[in-house]
């Protein structure tokens, strides 16, 4: 039952992230990418901290499952490690803007669904045939959904792939840390790191004007509270029960949600190819869950 609830939480997070591209696009038209990432992270830190203070019972309910395994200093370092990895994933992805097409970038980014299981195998996790079949179908589906032109490898594509590696590593380090650190504390620390790095670089590389920030206050608040605050905290809570390779597959649905959101909200068009791609992704993810609990190495309790 806890696993099912965690999967529902992660699906909710994916829906938020899939729709967040609208706010991201609005904010990015006025502010630089580092400024957007830094401010949304700062807003998220304030939001989560206020919730922890005002609802202490909620904070206590997120106590680590492996009590006593990590000292206070280790918990802090785990949070910093998660934040550093997340920052590089987000920043490297931003570097690629304009260097490749959005479709190719979307496809290459979700290749972390392959990277995470690959890393997991070296860490001792076992994958069953259903997961492998589902993974292959998901990759094919994302290609149909995202790549609309001939696929040729360029520098921008390599940069996106590097960011995908960092996103995959982030899922792995969250999987380790979530069992040892309070979920809300871990979320706060990692977002503090992202905010410091992003705003620090933004002050050097970008021009920050208060009037510009105020002009996109609404999308920034939505990004900070919903996408970063609830989103990354929800991911940590969910990963206490869900193995990392399953997490990566569920999180990859963000691209599908974004495509559907584009149709419903921005009146974008989805053709037969993209529709087939989304269907193949969904079928692949459903297949990947068959007999999942029987073949996976159980998580530590």
Sequence positions of predicted segments:
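Hydrophobic transmembrane alpha-helices of multi-pass small-molecule transport proteins
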Residues: 48, 127-147, 167, 198, ...
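C-terminal-most transmembrane helix of multi-pass membrane proteins
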Residues: 41-42, 49, 53-57, 216-218, ...
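Helix-helix packing/entry segments at the starts of transmembrane helices
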Residues: 39, 105-111, 174-195, 228-264
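Loop-to-transmembrane-helix transition segments
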Residues: 5-15, 61-92, 155-163, 202, ...
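Specific transmembrane alpha-helical segments of multi-pass solute transporters/efflux pumps
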Residues: 20-21, 49, 56-108, 142-144, ...
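Glycine-/small-residue-enriched transmembrane alpha-helix faces in small-molecule transporters
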Residues: 1-38, 84, 88, 92-95, ...
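Specific alpha-helical transmembrane segments that line the substrate/conduction pathway
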Residues: 35-46, 94-125, 163, 245-263
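Hydrophobic/small/kink-forming positions within alpha-helical transmembrane segments
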Residues: 18, 22, 49, 83, ...
């Amino acid at each position: 039952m806890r696993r099912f609830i965690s999967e529902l939480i992660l699906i909710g997070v994916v829906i938020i992230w899939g729709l967040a591209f609208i706010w991201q696009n609005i904010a990015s038209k006025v502010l630089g990418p580092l400024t957007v990432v830094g401010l949304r992270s700062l807003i998220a830190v304030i939001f989560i901290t206020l919730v922890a203070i005002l609802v202490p019972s909620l904070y206590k309910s997120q106590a680590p499952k492996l009590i006593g395994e990590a000292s206070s200093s280790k918990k802090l370092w785990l949070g910093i490690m998660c934040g550093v990895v997340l920052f590089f994933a987000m920043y490297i992805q931003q570097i690629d803007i304009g260097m490749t097409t959005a479709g190719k970038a979307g496809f290459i980014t979700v290749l972390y669904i392959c990277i995470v299981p690959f890393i997991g195998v070296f860490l001792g996790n076992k994958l069953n045939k259903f997961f492998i079949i589902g993974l292959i179908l998901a990759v094919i589906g994302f290609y149909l959904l995202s790549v609309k032109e001939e696929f040729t490898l360029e520098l921008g594509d390599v940069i996106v792939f590097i960011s995908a590696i960092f996103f995959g590593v982030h899922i792995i380090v969250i999987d380790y840390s979530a069992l040892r650190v309070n979920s809300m504390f871990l979320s706060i620390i990692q977002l503090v790191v992202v905010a410091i790095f992003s705003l620090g670089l933004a002050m050097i590389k970008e021009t920050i004007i208060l009037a510009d920030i105020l002009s996109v206050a609404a999308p920034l608040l939505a990004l900070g509270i919903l996408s970063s605050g609830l989103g990354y905290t929800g991911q940590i809570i969910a990963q206490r029960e869900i193995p990392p390779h399953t997490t990566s597959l569920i999180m990859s649905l963000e691209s599908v949600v974004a495509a559907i959101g584009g149709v419903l909200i921005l009146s974008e068009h989805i053709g037969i190819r993209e529709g087939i791609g989304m269907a193949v992704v969904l079928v692949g993810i459903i297949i990947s869950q068959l007999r999942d609990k029987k073949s996976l190495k159980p998580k530590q309790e």
